[in-house]
């Protein structure tokens, strides 16, 4: 987690990952972010929507983010993305950035996709980005869960969860995906 809280990671998120992922994406006025970590992605996402709910599993990270963003349009919630505590069809868009590889096994990732489909309104967009498998990343995550998603598997997995119009593209840092809920 140390690197994910670093200035180097913040710069990469702000200058490359989110500009690449969010180009042409509209999240609507009530968006959901899963796995914000220290909130570098949240800082940008909060400017793209009227209200942002950020769901973080780690209580310490959630508390720090909630304190830092108190009084803004961001609500930070401690929660598990495989079992979201929200009513169906609540959110107008959803985002996840470099978090899905921390979920194992693949069936748990698929539960996240299904939960996102459940809490999104019809026609809403999910935008996600993550890295692809590499030996370097495997070593970096040796004391952590590391279960990267093969970008070739995203389309069928997201469609099985209820998404359509799935678009996956790869770039230097991994993959970016947008999917519209049918």
Language-model segments: residues:
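Class I SAM-dependent methyltransferase SAM/SAH-binding core
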Residues: 32, 37-83
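A short glycine-rich, Lys/Arg-flanked "PGG" loop and its adjoining helix->strand segment in the class I
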Residues: 110-122
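Short glycine-centered segments of the SAM/dcSAM-binding site in methyltransferase folds
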Residues: 30, 124-125
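C-terminal alpha-helical "lid/dimerization" subdomain adjacent to the S-adenosyl-L-methionine
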Residues: 4, 9-10, 125-178
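A conserved beta-strand element that flanks and buttresses the S-adenosyl-L-methionine
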Residues: 95-96
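Conserved alpha-helix/loop element of class I SAM-dependent methyltransferases that forms part
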Residues: 10-29
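A short His-aromatic
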Residues: 101-105
